[in-house]
C-alpha cells in the first residue's frame, strides 16, 4: 500500500514530534515569553505512537524522523527508536538541538538511530546565546564531537540564517564543515517564528550562500533524489565535508514533497504551513481500528496542499510556531 495525494506525489517520509517541550528558546522558533505547553494527557503516549508508527509503515512510509520540541527531553525516546527499528523502518533519523546529545549518543546508536541533524546557528558563543537564549554552546559543540566519533558520523549540522544576526558566518560554517568532515546545511529563514517578526528582508537566499562559499572554496554538486529538500555540494579540492542548501522561500520544492508531519498532540499536518490540523488522536482514543486509521490518513493525505504559498500575496503564516509543529 502507498500514500499518494491528488497531485500524484507519493508520501514516504514522516516527521514524528514526540514532545512540544524544548530547553531552548530560539528566536526564529519560540516566543521569549512563557508558553502554554500541552497537558501531558494531550500528548500522544508512547503506546499510541508505537501503534501509529506501525500504521504509517503499512501505508508505505519508509523514512521516519523523530523531532520535537526537543526530542531528547522526553524520557523513553531511545525505546521508541528501538520500536521503529523493530518495525523495519528503512531510515530512522532525529533532529536535536544537541544539548543532551553527548550523554545520549551511544544509547541512540544502540537503539537503532541511523542519522542525526543538530541545530547550530552560530559558531560564536555570545551570538549563540542571543539566538537560543541559553548558555549551551559548549554542550552542543561537545555533542557534535561525540557524534563525529560515533556510527552516526558524518553528522548533519543545520543553521538557519537570519540577515543581520548570523549571515556573516557563512564562510565560518563552511570552514567548520571542512575541519570536522561533517555535513553543513544552510536553511532559509521561514515564517514560523512565534513572535511573527519574519519578513523577506531577513531571508538569506541560498544562491547567495552558494556564491560566497564557492568563491572561497569551489564546489561541485552531488546528485540527489528529486524529493530531497537539500541541494548538496562537495568541495572540489577533495577536502572532506559537504554543504547542503535548503531554500523553501527562494527555490520552493513543494512539487516533489514527500513529507507529512505528526504533531506531539496527535494532529496530522500535510505541510509545515497548513492552516488546518487533522485530528488523529481523537480517532485513536475513540477506539478506531487500524483500518479506520488507514482510511482517515489516506483521505487526509489525498488533500495535501499543492504548496506552501509563501510567495503568494495572500500568504499568512500558520498559527502554530515551529516548536508546536515539529521539525
What is each model feature region?
Residues 34-39, 124-131, 193-197, 279-280:
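A short acidic, helix-capping loop that chelates divalent metal ions and anchors anionic groups
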Residues 43-66, 70-187:
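Radical SAM/AdoMet-radical enzyme domain recognition
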